[in-house]
């Protein structure tokens, strides 16, 4: 994220509204430039922009390094503005420390609890798309809200998104049509898809996190400690992070797809995650009547080939 990470850190740690607004104001042109370059490169092609999703700790200074820095300064009897600032920063970081960051303040939760953060991203997207239109280009942008577990979360973000895009369109003198959808990466989201579909123009199944939250696995931990033994014992025949677990995670995908389309016929459904480049998983998603898969660039040739094979049976 470069300079953007530092500015997001300032937004999150701001002690006053003025501090937060200053950081947001500095971040806006950077994000607008990011999105302008993206839409320019993808002119006429669909682009889905996911709002900020990383866990909170990825935007904060390293807690251990900061604690050591403060402890060393205190042991040396150092004083001054920098030492005081480091102490305040450590206090703030300690307050925000999470035991399980992947299930903590991230995604839509971070956006709802950090005033102005998602609003800034939406404004930057709207301004970038408007400038492309005024330049005679054809931006096709969608906004995706991560880690939604309740339809009310999506309603809150969608209402703010539509308000901001309306302001931008009026100011720029253009018409903006920006679908707003959500990731389905929590079991509760899958099981309440009939409600969430009310506020969504599309679903994208985040199967990496959906696998973690369904199995109760922390992927970074269990792959090095559990998986080899589970494969030997026959609990797995293959890692559920490589090929979709059709009976568990896959069943949630099926439920969400069926229930979502009962509420909103024609609801666009897709997959983002490593499973989108796995041949067996792609065939499963085709049978589940999903519209598309997305994959890492190096997996795209396989994904295209297998999607074609699935389509022709």
Which residues are covered by each model-predicted region?
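Conserved alpha/beta-domain cores
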Residues: 1-313
């Amino acid at each position: 994220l470069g300079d953007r990470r530092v500015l997001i850190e300032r937004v999150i740690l701001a002690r006053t509204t003025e501090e937060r607004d200053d950081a947001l104001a500095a971040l806006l042109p950077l994000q607008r430039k990011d999105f302008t370059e993206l839409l320019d490169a993808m002119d006429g092609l669909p682009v889905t922009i996911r709002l900020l999703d990383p866990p909170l700790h990825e935007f904060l200074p390293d807690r251990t390094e900061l604690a050591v820095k403060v402890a060393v300064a205190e042991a040396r009897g150092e004083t001054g503005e920098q030492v005081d600032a480091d102490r305040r920063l450590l206090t703030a970081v300690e307050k925000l420390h999470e035991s399980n960051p992947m299930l903590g303040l991230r995604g839509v939760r971070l956006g709802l609890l950090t005033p102005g953060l998602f609003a800034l991203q939406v404004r930057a997207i709207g301004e970038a798309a408007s400038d492309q239109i005024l330049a005679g280009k054809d931006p096709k942008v969608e906004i995706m809200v991560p880690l939604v577990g309740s339809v009310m979360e999506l309603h809150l973000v969608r209402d703010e998104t539509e308000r901001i895009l309306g302001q931008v369109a009026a100011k720029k003198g253009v018409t903006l049509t920006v679908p707003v959808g959500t990731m389905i990466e929590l079991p509760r989201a899958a099981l309440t898809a009939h409600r969430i579909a009310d506020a969504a123009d599309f679903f994208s199944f985040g199967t990496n996190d959906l696998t973690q939250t369904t199995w109760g696995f922390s992927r970074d931990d269990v792959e090095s400690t559990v998986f080899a033994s589970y494969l030997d014992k026959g609990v797995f025949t293959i890692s559920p992070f490589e090929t979709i677990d059709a009976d568990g995670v896959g069943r949630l995908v099926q439920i969400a797809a069926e229930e979502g389309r009962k509420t909103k016929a024609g609801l666009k459904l897709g997959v983002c995650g490593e499973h989108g480049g796995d041949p067996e998983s792609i065939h499963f998603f085709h049978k589940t009547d999903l519209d598309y898969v997305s994959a890492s660039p190096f997996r795209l040739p396989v994904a295209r080939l297998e999607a074609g094979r699935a389509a022709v049976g």
